[in-house]
Amino acid sequence: GADRQTCVIHCAGIVSVASHPGDRIYRVNVGGTNNILRLCAKCGIGKLVYVSSVHAIPEKPEGTEITENAVFSPELVRGDYAKSKAIATALVFDAAKRGLNASVVFPSGIIGPGDSGKGSITNMLLAFLSGKLPVAVKGGYDFVDVRDVASGITACAEHGLPGHGYILSGHYASIRDILEAAKKTLNLRRAVSYLPICFAKVVAPIYERWSFKSEIPSLFRFWDDEMLACKRRDEVVLPEIVLSKIVRNSYDR
């Protein structure tokens, strides 16, 4: 059974970029985390690592670096996914204050092989490959290789301090960068028009309803025009991403 030698890594959850994902996202992301915390305390486990998300961290003005030292509240973030992760993160830190040896990691946009659940970036690449992505959004995000996230989680399990959080980031890539890398890596000829963020925000609700009915991935709400600059800690050092390699690995599943 579980004891002081046991390390629990809580990475289960629902990721959704939908504007209205429903109550299930709270039942799983918040309720599930609460259950894990209760069982960890009951069984006296030695270590808990909770896999949160950078979406749980409140945004700062453009050009300002975000850090793990933040107040986690659903009132300070946008979208149900971010709110659910912020609530769950606050629960974990509260448990750490009560004596649980718990640390939190905050991955940025995870990309790489083995995405059986087909996350947003994988869906975008698959849609692009099949010719179902006529338009995309200007802007981009900070992406991190899933294998580097796994290494970061392991490092946190071994060296993470109780009540501390660690951002697991890679580097910024624009949507254009990703699609151009896909074209070059996979020898594709695809034409894509790039919409300004301001226009994308206007048409996103309509596109989301249309994509749901036509089974085309809803992508607009995932992207932000602000660069996510993450502060890295010495305890969890991650290597740089080679974008073309990750694109290739995303297909070679």
Indicate where each model-derived feature is located.
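Conserved beta-loop-beta element that borders a ligand/cofactor-binding pocket
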Residues: 52, 90-113
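Substrate-positioning beta->alpha
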Residues: 35, 87, 120, 137-157, ...
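A conserved pocket-lining segment of Rossmann-fold NAD(P)-dependent short-chain dehydrogenase/reductase
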Residues: 73-76, 124-144, 148
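NAD(P)H-binding glycine-rich loop region in Rossmannoid oxidoreductase-like domains
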Residues: 1-31, 39
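A hydrophobic C-terminal alpha-helical subdomain
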Residues: 136-138, 146, 197-235, 246
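Conserved Rossmann-fold NAD(P)-dependent oxidoreductase catalytic core, especially the SDR/UDP-sugar
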Residues: 22-23, 31-81
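Mid/C-terminal beta-alpha module of Rossmann-like enzyme folds, strongest
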Residues: 152-215, 244-253
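Conserved catalytic-site region of short-chain dehydrogenase/reductase
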Residues: 17, 54-64, 110-119
